[in-house]
Amino acid sequence: MSNQFDQLKKLSTIVCDSGDPELVKASGSQDATTNPSLILKVAQEPKFQELLNEAVVWGIRQNGDDLQTLSFILDKIQVNFALEIIKNIPGRISLEIDARLSFNVEAMVQRAVFLSQLFEAMGGDKKRLLVKIPGTWEGIRAVEFLEAKGIACNVTLIFNLVQAIAAAKAKATLISPFVGRIYDWWIAAYGDEGYSIDADPGVASVSNIYAYYKKFGIPTQIMAASFRTKEQVLALAGCDLLTISPKLLDELKKSQHPVKKELDPAEAKKLDVQPIELTESFFRFLMNEDAMATEKLAEGIRIFAGDTQILETAITEFIKQIAAEGA
């Protein structure tokens, strides 16, 4: 029998969640995702120093002010790594805009357009790029505009059905519901209850979103993310896409146990589910009613923003070093 990774590839598109081009290559996945946290882990490794150096020099040459220069460099670093990664996969790469813009529609649109244009200018195929936008109300409005302009979006930091419905209404190409972070919240809030995989809150959330989308023929793709265990991954076999860390991908490759399709669009269409209409006020009310989604969305934005700031600090020091060497 083939290993679980190969079996799973027949049921879902496999996406490697890493900023390391070499790990993505070794993964054998179709697509890849990255974010500031993942880029931060690899950007300063000696083997990738040239990708960082080139981005810094390029950013300085754009002749912006200090803040603009940092923004240019951050986006160029992402694009540099993305172009290396897509050499090793047949599919798409997801890149993320600055999380500090999560509540500014105009700024998110401008940054996403710039990132897309830069990716193309450096030789990337626009059809292979997804721009990750946070699942705030403002982020989803930015997605609505960007999708209409032909820029494919991945709505990230999805923690409940409300966000998923809003993203679908905005015609998002794809959403990323975070299985593991939902699970983390429930464990922190109520203690380790020893959830069986059938009762896993993160798995249940993605299953509900999947059922709603397939019931109503919504074309937005679902890419389950943020897995803590191999069991969570397997419990969502059949989901459109699964973005998985290199560690869990290795675990799947080492197991020969059979993989069962857990999510089926035909079964979803049989469910007695009513459509939900969302206005801005209703969206905000329902998010406020969901403590988990509210807290994890805020936390996710803070984490990504914090990692971006750390990366900016490293870049600033590197710029000073270049200036000192040129003096």
Curated annotation (Swiss-Prot):
<dbReference type="InterPro" id="IPR001585">
    <property type="entry name" value="TAL/FSA"/>
</dbReference>
<feature type="active site" description="Schiff-base intermediate with substrate">
    <location>
        <position position="132"/>
    </location>
</feature>
<dbReference type="InterPro" id="IPR004730">
    <property type="entry name" value="Transaldolase_1"/>
</dbReference>
<dbReference type="GO" id="GO:0004801">
    <property type="term" value="F:transaldolase activity"/>
</dbReference>
<keyword id="KW-0808">Transferase</keyword>
<dbReference type="InterPro" id="IPR018225">
    <property type="entry name" value="Transaldolase_AS"/>
</dbReference>
<keyword id="KW-0570">Pentose shunt</keyword>
<keyword id="KW-0963">Cytoplasm</keyword>
<protein>
    <recommendedName>
        <fullName>Transaldolase</fullName>
        <ecNumber>2.2.1.2</ecNumber>
    </recommendedName>
</protein>
<comment type="pathway">
    <text>Carbohydrate degradation; pentose phosphate pathway; D-glyceraldehyde 3-phosphate and beta-D-fructose 6-phosphate from D-ribose 5-phosphate and D-xylulose 5-phosphate (non-oxidative stage): step 2/3.</text>
</comment>
<keyword id="KW-0704">Schiff base</keyword>
<dbReference type="InterPro" id="IPR013785">
    <property type="entry name" value="Aldolase_TIM"/>
</dbReference>
<dbReference type="Pfam" id="PF00923">
    <property type="entry name" value="TAL_FSA"/>
</dbReference>
<dbReference type="GO" id="GO:0005975">
    <property type="term" value="P:carbohydrate metabolic process"/>
</dbReference>
<comment type="function">
    <text>Transaldolase is important for the balance of metabolites in the pentose-phosphate pathway.</text>
</comment>
<dbReference type="GO" id="GO:0006098">
    <property type="term" value="P:pentose-phosphate shunt"/>
</dbReference>
<dbReference type="GO" id="GO:0005737">
    <property type="term" value="C:cytoplasm"/>
</dbReference>
<comment type="similarity">
    <text>Belongs to the transaldolase family. Type 1 subfamily.</text>
</comment>
